[in-house]
Amino acid sequence: MLSLFDPGTGRAEPLVPGHRGELRILSRGGPPNLAGLCDLLLPDLIRRTTEWHRLRVASAWAETGAGTETGAGVKNGSGAAFRQAASALNLRPPDTDDLGSAADVCTGGDGGPPADGRWTRSGPVTFPADLGGTGPDPLAGLHDRGLDPLALRLVLLGRRYRDPFTVTWPALAAAEAELASWRGLVADWANLPSRPLSAAHRGRIAAAFDDDLDTPAALTVLRDLAADAAVPPGARFETFADADRLFGLDLVRDVGRDG
């Protein structure tokens, strides 16, 4: 089960689904820009980790400002570019506009904890001035340089979500190269005899996510697995494909592609 930092106790506590065994996530909107977009990674990771344990999830994005917030932008035509950017980062859209009852966990926002449920938020992220562009597309700078938006997701997964963080162009370029390397390996492994996934590596990855979303530790396991010649290629393929349900990096994208 996922344990998430609780500001009330100062330690990670199990995140227990409430209503009928369903975890309800409310994401308070930020500005419809790059920072607001990246804030949505936290609820996405909470959702993925909860679903990993075969639990149901319902999510909603809240409006916390007069039409200038993420939730508002997503709900009207002016939010089309924002929705496309969220999709490019593999951030799942909300299930509903109204959860119908109190949320079990609320993320983001500047107004402090909600009346009900756990409250948590990401640490501030600083970006290069030319990364977000000046138009409605928060990922314009990445597109201008021909970079995969998921390179940004990988960079953000490399830090603990509560820590302040600075994104740099060199880090994005390195993430782009690592993604290409992993996808190439996965495509090669897919052509070799299948083997059962590595339960040990799978367990370590899941344990890292359960431990207050320790994504840096989970990435370390993935990197170790990629280089572990003792694990058959078919097992590495199955483990990478399975773990990508948590990482959301499209690691099997190049399987079956020529060249």
Listing of model-derived features with the role each one plays in the protein:
Residues 1-35, 42, 52-259:
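Structural preference for alpha-helix termini/caps and helix-kink/transition segments
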